[in-house]
Amino acid sequence: MDAVILCAGKGTRLMPLTENIPKPMLPVGGAPILERIINKIDKLVENIYLIVKYEKEIIINHFKNNDKIKFIEQTDIDGTGYAVLMAKNHISGDFLVINGDIIFDDDLTNIVNDDVKNIITLNEVDNPSNFGVIVVDNQNNIIELQEKPKNPKSNLINAGIYKFENKIFDILETLRPSERGEVELTDAIKELIKENNIKGIKLNGYWNDIGKPWDLLDANTHILKNIKTDIKGKIGKNVVIEGAVIIEEGTEIKPNTVIEGPAIIKSGAIVGPLAHIRPNTVLMENTGVGNSSEIKGSIIMKNSKVPHLSYIGDSIIGENCNMGCNTITANLRFDNKPVMVNIKEEKVKSVRKFGAIIGHNVKTGIQVSFMPGVKIGSNSWIGANCLINNDIEKDSFVYKKEEIIIKTKRK
């Protein structure tokens, strides 16, 4: 059996993090989402076909040394259905299709070993209206698919993992683009439903469709629950390490630093002195957290620095950022209500504690503060003493004008 993983989309709801990086390559628990999916299925399949398009070079360069992986560029037409169709000339039998932006616990052996040819995996949720809803009969035959319905007939949703027989390619070739101009995989599934030829199987354990920034933090927290302590690198005097913590080779933890697990500190990171790393934090490769800085429940991506006297809480900082002294991310409203975040020009409720989403190559001056839920576009500079309470577009230069009055003292 082979597998097709859909990795071509832009991931606009995760902007600014996806302004330079494809969504499947965003880190969760210290590794890209796509790498976690591939590790799940590596022993179940013979070949893995990655359907790529947006920022494809990043994906190709990361996985180019894996002989099992082949890359197919999605051309001409957008849509998940057309993405699957791109693999037609490479696959002869049954195969898996997996969305490239999901985190899940299930090992998928039940799906692979099941005699049923066409399967959609299902997950039970409290908010089915946000997803594609699946209705099944008492034998798990799928009898209806509803796309983000206002009045869902079920709390079972499409979990984005499928098994198909080769016949699906014939159906996909007959489909016309939707109103969005895309060939949709769901339209092919509806044809299988008409034929009474597709079943649903519930996934076991955790599942998360990484569609919004706080989903990254939720999945990150879940993965960190299962880590085991593995401490390498250079550990300075009076360093306190509590709970499950992974510190990779090539790191340096300077004196009097406190690290509370679960947490992961990747190779090349320099932490301290007097830094405080709190639970559910991941510091990616070559990051820096300096004197008296505190990081809590956050992801700091590659090559980014939080040098001194700063607080980063429930936030995500992109690659190659530098936070000036006393940079603060606020993460809680006075009324304890969910933090509101702009997603594609719409205000969306996130979670109770949620900080800032900072894109790539961002610099802040001294004493910059971010209000809960703000997003900072990539390649932006935020000048000293700014309080940021609105989203900032990429390539912006934000600064504050203040009049400084200088007088001669009276004698």
UniProtKB/Swiss-Prot annotation:
It is an enzyme of class 2 (transferase). Pfam families: Hexapep, NTP_transferase. Residues 205-224 are annotated as: Linker. N-acetyl-alpha-D-glucosamine 1-phosphate binds at T80, G132, E144, N158. Gene3D superfamilies: Hexapeptide repeat proteins, Spore Coat Polysaccharide Biosynthesis Protein SpsA, Chain A. UTP binds at L6, C7, A8, G9, Q74, G79. One of its GO terms (molecular function) is glucosamine-1-phosphate N-acetyltransferase activity. Residues 1-204 are annotated as: Pyrophosphorylase. It catalyses: N-acetyl-alpha-D-glucosamine 1-phosphate + UTP + H(+) = UDP-N-acetyl-alpha-D-glucosamine + diphosphate; alpha-D-glucosamine 1-phosphate + acetyl-CoA = N-acetyl-alpha-D-glucosamine 1-phosphate + CoA + H(+). Its EC number is 2.7.7.23, 2.3.1.157. It comes from the Archaea. Residues 225-411 are annotated as: N-acetyltransferase. Pathway: Nucleotide-sugar biosynthesis; UDP-N-acetyl-alpha-D-glucosamine biosynthesis; N-acetyl-alpha-D-glucosamine 1-phosphate from alpha-D-glucosamine 6-phosphate (route II): step 2/2; Nucleotide-sugar biosynthesis; UDP-N-acetyl-alpha-D-glucosamine biosynthesis; UDP-N-acetyl-alpha-D-glucosamine from N-acetyl-alpha-D-glucosamine 1-phosphate: step 1/1. Acetyl-CoA binds at A384, K401. The active site is at H308 (proton acceptor). GO terms for biological process: UDP-N-acetylglucosamine biosynthetic process. Keywords: Acyltransferase, Multifunctional enzyme, Nucleotidyltransferase, Repeat, Transferase. InterPro entries: Bifunctiontional_GlmU_arc-type, GlmU-like, Hexapep, NTP_transferase_dom, Nucleotide-diphossugar_trans, Trimer_LpxA-like_sf. Catalyzes the last two sequential reactions in the de novo biosynthetic pathway for UDP-N-acetyl-glucosamine (UDP-GlcNAc). Responsible for the acetylation of GlcN-1-P to GlcNAc-1-P, and for the uridyl transfer from UTP to GlcNAc-1-P, to produce UDP-GlcNAc and pyrophosphate. In the N-terminal section; belongs to the N-acetylglucosamine-1-phosphate uridyltransferase family. This is Bifunctional protein GlmU.
